[in-house]
Amino acid sequence: PYELIHVAIQLDEDEREAYDLAYERYRTFARENRIVFRTPADWSKFMQVCARSREGREAFTAWRFARGLAKASRAKLRTLWTILCRHRHQQAILFTDDNATAYTIGETFFLPVITHHTKISERKALLTAFREGKVNCMVTSRVLNEGVDVPEVAVGIVVSGSGSVREHVQRLGRILRPGPDKRAVLYELVSEDTGETFTSVRRRQHAAYQRE
């Protein structure tokens, strides 16, 4: 059995204001250029239009800023610390959608990080230490989505992620390992009233996210 816990996080007032300003700048540019995001092709069009002018580049920068803020806001990091303390006697894997967020978490909480930049030898050493219980918590940016056996993990924390159903079912698979009296937990941290809200809705529509 496993438990899914959706955690909605309110941004701090100053970060909320900064997010809204940046997001509105990006959306205004998209509207002025008649770009409606319905398919991946629309995003490609947005990127092409952004590259043609200073205003476009500023709009893209604003989008990146807002997205990064939602992924690793102060409020989200505080919430993450609370969860880590709650499960301090259990092994946990933290999932992020990008390397920058993974490294921010690693530096903030002094946790080992595995990304595609991590050397193979270092990755193997960390995973071995994790399996042997010498490392209690690990942060990864997509690298562990598939093909890695970590049988003792009972806690997963999705700090940020894409809307890919396949990706998140794989994340469930990383923690849902059979064991006596074991109940796995998957936390999903979502910055409320940001682009993360819509991403969360998409991925949780999958049957794997409906089970309790």
Protein language model annotation of sequence segments:
Residues 13-16, 20, 77, 124, ...:
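Amphipathic alpha-helical transducer elements in NTP-driven molecular machines
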Residues 17-18, 148-150, 164-169, 180, ...:
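Switch/connector loops and helix/strand junctions flanking conserved nucleotide-binding motifs
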Residues 91-96, 100-148, 166-169:
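Conserved helicase ATPase core of P-loop NTP-dependent helicases/translocases
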Residues 127, 155, 163-185:
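Conserved SF2 helicase motif VI
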Residues 174-207:
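Conserved segment of the helicase C-terminal RecA-like domain
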